[in-house]
């Protein structure tokens, strides 16, 4: 008798928009779709290379949704995001399908009034300046969790 498998969708807006990072963590690239999260802002964080989002009226965050995430994969993402983020249910707009609304999960910065949040984090800048080092850190993280090895 087989149990039901719950599949999740997760809106990502920072380092997890990079397929290479996701592959190291999940050992695969899930199906994705471009999406926008309304009423949030993506901040840079002093001393960090990854971003944080917190609620912000009349703002929006561009990212993508990862589909078909298993419970085990969601647990890996929870570990990766650590205690600085809280997993929350949000509604995003899928930008590839005439702004269809989708309920999904995302990781919101836990400390809403953090003085270390500033400006706007830029994915393209991160890819150029920090992705290589971030991939090394992610690979070490995956090895610590004894995740299956990904061929990058």
Curated annotation (Swiss-Prot):
InterPro entries: AIG2-like, AIG2-like_dom, GGCT-like, GGCT-like_sf. The active site is at residue 81. Keywords: Acyltransferase, Transferase. It is an enzyme of class 2 (transferase). Its EC number is 2.3.2.-. CDD domains: GGCT_like. Expressed mainly in leaves. It holds the Pfam family GGACT. Substrate binds at residues 13-18. Belongs to the gamma-glutamylcyclotransferase family. Putative gamma-glutamylcyclotransferase. This is AIG2-like protein D. It comes from Arabidopsis thaliana.
